[in-house]
Structures are given as C-alpha cells and as structure tokens.
Amino acid sequence: MQPQYKFFAFISYNSHDIAWGKRLQRKLEGYRMSATLCSEHGWQRKPINPIFFAPSDIQPGGLTEELQERLKTSRHLIVICSPHSARSEWVGKEIEYFHQLGRTKNIHFFIVDGEPHSGNPDTECFNPIVETLGLPEILGANVHEQIFRWSWLNKERAYVQLISKLLGVEFDAIWQRHKRLLYSKIIAWTLGILGILSTLTSVYIINQPTDVKVMLNET
C-alpha cells in the first residue's frame, strides 16, 4: 500500500532565494496537466498539490521538530540550488534528513544560480552534503541552461523538466503541449494588443475635426 503524504513536495531553500521559492510554489501548484494524462494516471487536473514552502506555513530556521514532521509528510524534496543554498547549513540538514527517511530517489534539484560541480565556493550550487552522502549523479533542472534564444522559455523548460521528474512522466509528453499553450497565449496577447491599438486609432480619428479627418484618410 502506498504511504499517504500530507504534502506533495517540500521546498528547501536559502532566504536569499525566497523569491524563487515563492515563484516555484505558485508554478507547481497551478500547473494544469492534460486531461489525457490525468485520465491515464488517475490525477487531478492540478496534480502537484499541496507544496510546503516555509514562508506560507512556518518560519524557516533550524531543523525543528515541526520542520522534521513536514519533511516526513512530504512525498518529494525540492532543493533550490544556488551558491547561497550551497553554503547553507540548514539546507544541508534538510537534504540529509530526507535522505535518512529513505527517499533519496525523491530528492530533486532546481538550479537558479551558480554552476554544478564547479569546485569554486563562489559559484558552486550544490550543497556539500550531496557529495558527503554519496548521492547519485545529479542533473538538476537549470533555469539558465541555454536551449532557446529567449531566457523566459529556458525557465519554462526548467519548470516542466522538474514537473516531469516529480510526476514520473516523459519530459516530451508534457513539454510539447506546454510549448503549444505558451505560443497560443503569445499569439492571443499580440492580437489583443493590436486590437486595442486599432480601436484607439479609430477613436482618435473620430474625435478629430473634419479637415483633419480628411487629411488622415487621404494618407
């Protein structure tokens, strides 16, 4: 029988990366999966719920009994990786504790700054506990990985990469649909803006004196 968890995932982070934590929680909890995949796997349309993130639930700090309980009742651990979190004692303790629970395969890394395995404390993004525990080779989702020309699309790809790992589905199974939805939104926004500009231009012409209207129409 599968264990029941209160939280789908626990986000571990350093306070310098709090904005990324909030953004990630919002992205994951709000992600709508396709009806086809939901039907195949028995998911809800928003399957990654709820996410435990300290600012909205409890003040971060030491690895208190309360935080330990939240880790115990979380199916996955998501570590926001940056040079700040790499130097954080408490991020290391949260990783170590989750590892001790026997859920190492459910530890996921989301890289927002720095470089993996750089060997330089100023740029290294993985906490040293990762090497100390001998965790398997890690390829975290990296928001700065240059796959596309546009940085916002690289970030979206990293979000979907993490989502695919959390749900245990092929990346392409959800990425292609996600891209189509993004492009559809961009087209809709562009058409909406053009429509507004066209309306404003028409209103401007209507409100001009007659001789100005004639000049505008002639041009």
What is the predicted role of each segment?
Residues Q44, S82, S88, N217-E218:
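Residue-level signal for threonine
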Residues G30-I51:
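Short mixed-charge
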Residues I205-T219:
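Ser/Thr/Pro/Gly-rich low-complexity linker/stalk segments immediately outside membranes or between
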Residues S74:
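An anion/phosphate-binding loop that grips the pyrophosphate of nucleotide cofactors and donors
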Residues M1-E29, P50, S56-R70, P83-E89, ...:
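C-terminal interaction surface of TIR/SEFIR-family domains
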Residues L77-V79:
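Inter-motif core of Ras-like GTPase G domains
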Residues Y5, R45-P47, T210:
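A short, polar/charged loop/turn motif at coil->beta-strand junctions and beta-hairpin connectors
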